[in-house]
Amino acid sequence: MVYAIVRAGGRQEKVSVGDFVTLNRVAGGAGSTIELPALLLVDGDKITTAAADLAKVTVTAEILQDLRGPKIVIQKFKNKTGYKKRQGHRQELTKVKITGIK
């Protein structure tokens, strides 16, 4: 089994060919192809971690759609002063399909 650890959207993800992965927003529209930098490559019993060897490895992915994560609510409250603050946030995400590890 071939899989790679890639850096994508400020995080590290374990991916193999055919996987669907949700990342922090990546530039590009639906249908475009992106390359992700590999940090580790496992091909059966062979493990590659050397930077010189990983520079030759390309992990390609196809952008499927841009979406938004669930809404989270942030609240601040200070007792006895009447101070209240409420804020919401939805993270911008991109869903990709891993198309190749070479």
Swiss-Prot record:
UniProt keyword annotation of Cell inner membrane present: no
Highest taxon, organism lineage: Bacteria
GO biological process: translation
InterPro entries: bL21-like, bL21-like_sf, Ribosomal_bL21, Ribosomal_bL21_CS
Gene Ontology terms, MF aspect: rRNA binding; structural constituent of ribosome
A GO-annotated cellular component: cytoplasm
Listed Pfam families: Ribosomal_L21p (PF00829)
Keywords linked to the UniProt accession: Ribonucleoprotein, Ribosomal protein, RNA-binding, rRNA-binding
NCBIfam families: L21 (TIGR00061)
Role: This protein binds to 23S rRNA in the presence of protein L20.
HAMAP family reported for this sequence: Ribosomal_bL21 (MF_01363)
Family: Belongs to the bacterial ribosomal protein bL21 family.
Subunit structure: Part of the 50S ribosomal subunit. Contacts protein L20.
The protein's name in its UniProt record: Large ribosomal subunit protein bL21
